[in-house]
């Protein structure tokens, strides 16, 4: 008889990489135990309710705020600081329909992750909605539309015919980037700043250059390497039009958290065992000792990845729960985009002549599932080497003015310092999970594949 406390693999932490790995191992008929000391899924990829936030606010009065994500010392948490302010408790929504994401991200419609969600039918556990890059405030303090497609370029009345031709030449280059001649050019420039590439190779400058670097690439500084930027722009253009007039998808109720739960649910369907809120005393190479004294063993133990070993940049992020009518923030050319999720970008020096980094704003309305009707959620982020409080306050004023609503009120404010991976999508996380899967089981095993189709009974 099998030992009930013995497994093929024990996974500690339910971040997205581990959740994907958990599903893949369970699909490969491995006996998997998945543990998380937190009471919620996702770790840094997860989300909190306002009730969770109130509990954490009490916890960080007693411990270092960077320790709110339990990690058992098994890895270095990417979350370095977490501060909560309830600015008007009387206006906090009474229902449970508000979430805060530790690290909100979108999914490119053309990404490998979306393909995997489709092939495995795990998308059935998610409610996916579109999101768009919307507006950018240039360094000349002019609001412009981010060019998401060729049609946007042709219809841009602020671009001369000569400028449109230059932009189209750049878009053609990106579309044919796999050509040998173009690859040689990319190799020459891959580690050099992207803005120099745009200026010297394509003679692009000014507002259109800013819209590419800070709009399409969501870069926080102008020094993004050329290869990273081109990879992002290529995904953006490939994604636009795949499912509609947008490039991004998000999952309702918190993208990262819902992705983690979707893969964990798939793992559980295939026999994986889960333990949330489970305190761990000690982790060895082949066993885990819980706080209650029980011991669990496995051929392989996987803990959350040490983010410090991966390329990252330290950022400041501010979460704001706002009460009021923010619909104009989702409006385009007089028509409501009906997305309730948009991205607004601030170029360097657009907020203040003393501030040389970009600020990125992700805005979610009630249609995203992240907040109730009559509220919206704003996420602002910039590099950590900035005077963040002043900059975020100025950006908030710009958004309030742009919203066209005179009676917006900020209810909750959360400030974070965290290490963010340099890429803005989830495919690197998928690659990491796949690499670890083959490291554990070998190259002869198939990753998230099995005979036959995914049956309705599996749900």
Curated annotation (Swiss-Prot):
Family statement drawn from the similarity comment of this UniProt entry: Belongs to the Rab GDI family.
Xref: Gene3D superfamilies: FAD/NAD(P)-binding domain, Guanine Nucleotide Dissociation Inhibitor, domain 1, Guanine Nucleotide Dissociation Inhibitor, domain 2
The Gene Ontology CC terms held by the record are: cytosol; nucleus; Rab-protein geranylgeranyltransferase complex
Q: What is its main location?
A: cytoplasm
Q: What is a GO molecular function of this protein? A: GDP-dissociation inhibitor activity
BP-aspect Gene Ontology terms: small GTPase-mediated signal transduction; vesicle-mediated transport
* Pfam families in the record: GDI (PF00996)
Query: Which species is the source of this protein?
Result: Schizosaccharomyces pombe (strain 972 / ATCC 24843)
Q: What is this protein's name?
A: Uncharacterized Rab geranylgeranyltransferase C15C4.03
Q: Give the InterPro entries listed for this entry.
A: FAD/NAD-bd_sf (IPR036188), GDP_dissociation_inhibitor (IPR018203), Mrs6 (IPR017230)
Q: Where in the cell is it found?
A: Cytoplasm; Nucleus
The protein's matches in PANTHER family, at most eight in alphabetical order, are given as:
CHM, RAB ESCORT PROTEIN 1, RAB GDP-DISSOCIATION INHIBITOR
Q: Which UniProt keywords apply?
A: Cytoplasm, Nucleus
